[in-house]
Amino acid sequence: MNRISVFYEHMAEAMKQENITLDEVCAAVKRFGFDGVELDANRIKNEGDVILPALQKAGLCVNGIYNFFDFIHFFVF
């Protein structure tokens, strides 16, 4: 099954620009034909208790989780 996803960061920006709630943006995303959301791992850690139920309520799923790593400071050369 193919899923079309949107980055949650775009949804967060839409909430700011349009002054709408998370539930409203989730409903709009679903209405626009998206099935899933790509989420930053840190956002899930910090806001998952709010975001995940709203996604589920709208019939959306988490299609991918990404994170950013600072490898230049992780490895000692």
Name each region found by the language model.
Residues 1-77:
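N-terminal pre-domain/capping segments
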